[in-house]
Amino acid sequence: MALTQGPLTFRDVAIEFSQEEWKSLDPVQKALYWDVMLENYRNLVFLGILPKCMTKELPPIGNSNTGEKCQTVTLERHECYDVENFYLREIQKNLQDLEFQWKDGEINYKEVPMTYKNNLNGKRGQHSQEDVENKCIENQLTLSFQSRLTELQKFQTEGKIYECNQSEKTVNNSSLVSPLQRILPSVQTNISKKYENEFLQLSLPTQLEKTHIREKPYMCKGCGKAFRVSSSLINHQMVHTTEKPYKCNECGKAFHRGSLLTIHQIVHTRGKPYQCGVCGKIFRQNSDLVNHRRSHTGEKPYKCNECGKSFSQSYNLAIHQRIHTGEKPYKCNECGKTFKQGSCLTTHQIIHTGEKPYQCDICGKVFRQNSNLVNHQRIHTGEKPYKCNICGKSFSQSSNLATHQTVHSGNKPYKCDECGKTFKRSSSLTTHQIIHTGEKPYTCDVCDKVFSQRSQLARHQRSHTGEKPYKCNECGKVFSQTSHLVGHRRIHTGEKPYKCDKCGKAFKQGSLLTRHKIIHTREKRYQCGECGKVFSENSCLVRHLRIHTGEQPYKCNVCGKVFNYSGNLSIHKRIHTGEKPFQCNECGTVFRNYSCLARHLRIHTGQKPYKCNVCGKVFNDSGNLSNHKRIHTGEKPFQCNECGKVFSYYSCLARHRKIHTGEKPYKCNDCGKAYTQRSSLTKHLIIHTGEKPYNCNEFGGAFIQSSKLARYHRNPTGEKPHKCSHCGRTFSHITGLTYHQRRHTGEMPYKCIECGQVFNSTSNLARHRRIHTGEKPYKCNECGKVFRHQSTLARHRSIHTGEKPYVCNECGKAFRVRSILVNHQKMHTGDKPYKCNECGKAFIERSKLVYHQRNHTGEKPYKCIECGKAFGRFSCLNKHQMIHSGEKPYKCNECGKSFISRSGLTKHQTKHTAESLKTKFNVEKPLDVLLTSGFK
């Protein structure tokens, strides 16, 4: 589809002839020329593109020998915007003088008569009536301007008409020059010749004639434009159908009408005498060559007095000055919106018609303007013809280059009158000003959401359609926005073009650099009204407020799960699709989002850039550092709406909520077991597969969990370099030593809010809290019994299997749990590291010391809800509560009798043992038999 690009001027559609060329045309061609040029002018005026200059020359008519007079008509409008001058020039050979008269509304004007071989350059009313002589011209030339009355009134109130500059217009000695009424839009010029002794009269039509002229019975259904004759309507409709049946054999250009093709073909038959010495381009007029040369020289002779900006063309300066004056002379009849340029109005009017005639051949996308199509096609071709002379960066659009160059210059000429903020582009200023007005004229048809910019609406609509037209050539990933594709490509290239002036850190995106700079300035302007927390960006505050409101506006279409951030929803959807687009080059592990890959890469590098200012602990992720700091501050911003419990982390709150809902969304397909967390399901699945997906390429080990791989990477040899100065025990990690030393020092920094009990680690505190919440997330598959701790469940499972893997080397006794073996071994060594400060009694286990100390303090923190009785140990409370519930979980296999405690069952089972011995040895005292026989 051959369509023109850019704003159209009258020069683009005008064909000019020299005297020799004009003589070579036959009368039919001359008549055709007049008709076409007049029609072109009408069309330009209708589109709001007012030509700078239009010249019509009527060649000499007749022969002076036969009594006919030769005459030439020239209509010209100068470039100045507030003055439009038209001139009539008539060459006279046999006349002595001339009187000239025209009407302007109800006022008559007369010009001074002119004698033969004299010039007349007059203004309206400049000459007196006495100067007018009685002898008149033999022929009459009448120009009738047909227009609407409202348009006539509009033009009559504007400006003034003044004489032609003689330095620009050369007039023959035997010619008359006089300003005429300006030509109005939709003008029609009727030229007639009479051989009578009358004044030369230029008149406007009467009101009756205007009524008759306005009748246009043929209307276009596409745009509503009306025509007087049906042939004009047929020609016009080709604009909508884009049909161009008339094609030039020379260059292939197509036209709606045959007459336009005829005029166009003259271009090929005549020369272009003005050639550029730099690039060889040729032009028909010298003025065009002069303007073109400025593109090579960079000359910008037209300077703005307000801001000093320079331009190569005067009309560009005139348009620019409207920024300062605020003038917007072009108004849309549909919505009343005004524009600085007629071309902008033309572009805007397509919004109302919905017409998008320009289509991309590759992806089928349609556009309102050809320039937009050309820019769009560069996405497919990758063409970037505009290069920055300073840094060499290339761009697909000249506007992007202009915007980029302001980075080097720092120039921000566009200032907001409301708040004083400055911008590099006028479009950015226009967008910014909507913040003050609050205007959001663009509405989504699907969800009725409103936007301040059309581009924002277009981006939003892709969330409904799912359209992702921008594809990465490296990995095939698709995106809904070009900016996302550009940012994504930097993952492959490693490019980080945005550098911080303060610390030198580089970023892939400008927005990340802006966010980073706030670290140096510490500027946080947006404060939360609920908790007082401040943020550097309003978007961060909006996201934070959802924590308090519980708003989760983003819903998964597959499982119905809701999220408070759109990014979280996008990552969640990959669970259903199985997509893991981010792969580690070191070990081949794949991830659903880039942040997980970035964190994982630090396992290989060992990098931990985030350090706690309080305790010096380092982290490989900023989120982990933020979470860690809450240990010191005690901050718990996440509260459960059901029970009011508060949490330090949102993940803990989400996990806790499932206690109330009973939700277990993660189900094993093999055995049907369900879990509240996906990580728990992942760990469980390894039981069935036996898979160890986390491989160490350095030392060859394989692990079930990534955390174990990370732990192994930190200490692959199993070395324990960290030694306790109190007891000599060694640890592989400093954290293990830190927790251990608290046993000696008695430091317990973690306190339970419910009962005040203190603990030396967060994990112990977390386990303890389940006592108050009643949470028992670990269930036995064999008997259905639930437990608060995973270790307790593991210990319980050995009851069913009978497995006792931990054997004492001293006495050979076996145990189900390693911790019990450790405590047992202290009986052989006599080691009792936990000593009571009150009475000096020592204990093997710290828990025994804690229980013992309650004898001195009288503390009984565990209280029965039923009867109010308090206990020093939780196990005692458990046993007591069975009295109220009637539960007896320990059953004797011999007689079926049940007991509240294991000790009660053990005591009971000795009765059966004694009875069997009594029967076997037939004695009354089986204990004596046991002592003498040694249990044989």
Curated annotation (Swiss-Prot):
Zinc finger (C2H2-type): 218-240, 246-268, 274-296, 302-324, 330-352, 358-380, 386-408, 414-436, 442-464, 470-492, 498-520, 526-548, 554-576, 582-604, 610-632, 638-660, 666-688, 694-716, 722-744, 750-772, 778-800, 806-828, 834-856, 862-884, 890-912
GO cellular component, one term: nucleus
Ranges for domain KRAB: 8-83
Family matches, as Pfam families: KRAB, zf-C2H2
Compartments, as annotated in UniProt: Nucleus
SUPFAM superfamilies: beta-beta-alpha zinc fingers (SSF57667), KRAB domain (Kruppel-associated box) (SSF109640)
Record GO terms (molecular function): DNA binding; zinc ion binding
Alphabetically ordered keywords of this record: DNA-binding, Metal-binding, Nucleus, Repeat, Transcription, Transcription regulation, Zinc, Zinc-finger
Gene3D superfamilies per the UniProt record, alphabetical: 6.10.140.140, Classic Zinc Finger
Record function comment: May be involved in transcriptional regulation.
Family: Belongs to the krueppel C2H2-type zinc-finger protein family.
Protein name as catalogued: Zinc finger protein 836
